[in-house]
Amino acid sequence: MKKMLKVGQIVNTHGIKGELKVTSLSDYLERFEELEWVYIQGYDEKYYIGNIKYRPTTVILSFEGYDNINIVEQFKGKYVLIDESQRRELPEDTFYKADLIGLDGYTVEEVYLGKLVDIIQAGSNEVYVFRDKETNKDILIPAVKEFIPEISLEKKRITVDPIEGMIE
């Protein structure tokens, strides 16, 4: 089975001509223009992208051969997926969110914080949410170089350099 990556979630239909409203899971909204086809969660076939329109918070997609609301309604709530081979090459020190979720967080003093369970958008920065499985407590760390000096996918860990009071 190929490894698939989520690039969007179909939140609704748009109009009556088979268009779908998609919430992008990528920081790069124009990502869909680089794709010839995608998969839809729960379906094995490739869906070739027809038209793409942009709204402030969503992307409106249509697929070739799917020109009726009744045909595409079944896709509501499903994820738009790509094959791992379709990944974009990212700049150095930039990571896919899916690759970060599940990594272990440690302070620079080697104190275990927990696993990264979520990445939330807070203003202009993302915030990493680490969860300690023993206490079930969430620790929120701004995802900026000042507090996150190192991320190692190979070691499956994120190093955190918190200021006083940040993790208490």
UniProtKB/Swiss-Prot annotation:
Q: Name one GO cellular component term.
A: cytoplasm
Q: Please, which domain of life does this record's source organism belong to?
A: Bacteria
The protein's GO terms of the molecular function aspect are: ribosome binding
Q: Name one Pfam family in it.
A: RimM
Give the PRC barrel domain ranges.
Answer: 92-166
Q: Where in the cell is it found?
A: Cytoplasm
**What InterPro entries does this protein's entry cite?**
PRC_barrel-like_sf (IPR011033), PRC_RimM (IPR056792), RimM (IPR011961), RimM_N (IPR002676), RimM_N_sf (IPR036976), Transl_B-barrel_sf (IPR009000)
Keywords assigned by UniProt, alphabetized = Chaperone, Cytoplasm, Ribosome biogenesis, rRNA processing
The record's Gene Ontology biological-process terms are:
ribosomal small subunit biogenesis; rRNA processing
Q: Which HAMAP family match?
A: Ribosome_mat_RimM (MF_00014)
Its family remark reads:
Belongs to the RimM family.
Which PANTHER family has this protein been placed in? RIBOSOME MATURATION FACTOR RIMM
Summarizing the function annotation, the protein's role is: An accessory protein needed during the final step in the assembly of 30S ribosomal subunit, possibly for assembly of the head region. Essential for efficient processing of 16S rRNA. May be needed both before and after RbfA during the maturation of 16S rRNA. It has affinity for free ribosomal 30S subunits but not for 70S ribosomes.
Could you give the subunit structure recorded for this chain?
Binds ribosomal protein uS19.
Q: Which NCBIfam families match?
A: 16S_RimM (TIGR02273)
| Record note on domains | The PRC barrel domain binds ribosomal protein uS19.
Protein known as? Ribosome maturation factor RimM
Give the originating organism: Alkaliphilus metalliredigens (strain QYMF)
